[in-house]
Amino acid sequence: MQVTVEKKEGIHCSLLIEVPANEIDSVVSKEINRTAKTIKMDGFRPGKVPAGMVKKKYGEQIRMEVISDLIPQKYSKAIQDEKLAVAGIEVELKENKEGQPLKFVANLELFPEFEVTGFEKIEVQKPVVELTDKEVKQMIENLRKQFATFSEVDKVVEKDDKVTIDFVGKKDGEAFEGGTANDIDVIIGSGQMIPGFEDGIIGMKKGEQKTITVTFPQDYQNKDLAEAETTFDITVKKIQQAELPEVNDEFVKKFGVKGGVDTFENEIKENMQRELKFILQRKVKDQVFKGLREIAEFETPKSLIKREIDAAKQNLLKQMGGAKGFDVNQLPDNLFEANAKQKVETSLILDSIMNSQEFKAEEAEVESLLDELVQAYEEPEKTKEQIKKNDKEIANLKALVIENKLTDWVLEQAKVTEKTEDFFEVIKENMQAQQAGF
């Protein structure tokens, strides 16, 4: 086999590979003879079909099957010999004739080689959130609202009321698509409608009609409406007032708590603290990764981005329960491209840093992280034992420990400031970020 490096520019490289004719023809001949012994053909007894007849009828097909098997073997050997770190490959067949060398080009995308410097340029705003009894009481109040019962009342609309409404949305005086609905239930203050909509209903009475003006958010999914000033003609058809359950032993049993109200309140606070810790870690880590992407200079292999896009599509299909009749591949790649590119770049950067630094996940550190994570489950010890039996899960935990160490290492060199934030705003932002990332 002869290998010629045709061109190597940045992360792109082409290998011209030539396989001697006798090697190809020998394998093809053996395959034809093997086929002749098993194939059934009219006029011949089984195993007695002449090889020449097989070659005449199936020779081209057999040759292509042989080549399809041989090409990956040959380019894999060439890549190994040339010591290339390949991210993606496309094969272009050049010459394929009996009695002549097989020639093909392997167009390669390589993993970029780069060093990350300038960590001091990274700016991170570290959120500081104080979790007090006030936030715990508010969380319990939110849980009470989830179990609220509603009864119709004759009064003006107030916060936390459930109202049944009709509305017609208009932009520049014309009704827009998706902006009209009838008999829609809205809980005032829930945030289920765009900002300003629910506030505009407060003070209205049953049977009252009113036109309100609201501006759609900048990041609204329908770009034709993003930042657009619109009007909504609203009719209130029913007003219902919420009746919240008392926080007693019967109420806390709905959440699987057996120790009474005090135990319930303690568990709520612990859950809030645990969730807050992970969210704040994620917020800081996201800023660190964003900063790393900004200072690192390299070309991102498109094949890796495409691979990540395909994985994101399959993950979406899985989240939808493998929806029958839905072809996820019909979704355009650009819906997933930005997130996919970020993931690939972040992964390449972290790998580059870890190659130059010695971050290790000690067994005690993995155990500590596992202990912390399983507290979110109903049966922590049982869950812990199940995870410890799963090699893949343990590998993921080790990777997370190393990732956390790397993040702390970058933070020691970055410009870090602190910003006080509200607990519920942080939770809301986290939910929005998760939804935006599919």
From Swiss-Prot:
Keywords of the record: Cell cycle, Cell division, Chaperone, Cytoplasm, Isomerase, Rotamase
Keyword Cell division appears in the UniProt entry: yes
One Pfam short name: Trigger_N
Source species, domain of life: Bacteria
Gene3D superfamilies, A to Z: 3.10.50.40, Trigger factor ribosome-binding domain, Trigger factor, C-terminal domain
Catalytic reaction(s) noted: [protein]-peptidylproline (omega=180) = [protein]-peptidylproline (omega=0)
Entry's Gene Ontology cellular component terms: cytoplasm
Domain PPIase FKBP-type: 160-245
Class of the enzyme per the UniProt entry, highest EC level: isomerase
Database matches in PROSITE patterns: FKBP_PPIASE
Compartment(s): Cytoplasm
SUPFAM superfamilies linked: FKBP-like, Triger factor/SurA peptide-binding domain-like, Trigger factor ribosome-binding domain
GO BP annotation list: 'de novo' cotranslational protein folding; cell division; chaperone-mediated protein folding; protein transport; protein unfolding
GO MF annotation, one: peptidyl-prolyl cis-trans isomerase activity
Keyword Isomerase: yes
The EC number(s) this enzyme carries: 5.2.1.8
Domain notes: Consists of 3 domains; the N-terminus binds the ribosome, the middle domain has PPIase activity, while the C-terminus has intrinsic chaperone activity on its own.
Its biological purpose: Involved in protein export. Acts as a chaperone by maintaining the newly synthesized protein in an open conformation. Functions as a peptidyl-prolyl cis-trans isomerase.
Family: Belongs to the FKBP-type PPIase family. Tig subfamily.
Name of protein: Trigger factor
Source organism phylogeny: Bacteria, Pseudomonadati, Pseudomonadota, Gammaproteobacteria, Thiotrichales
Gene that encodes it: tig
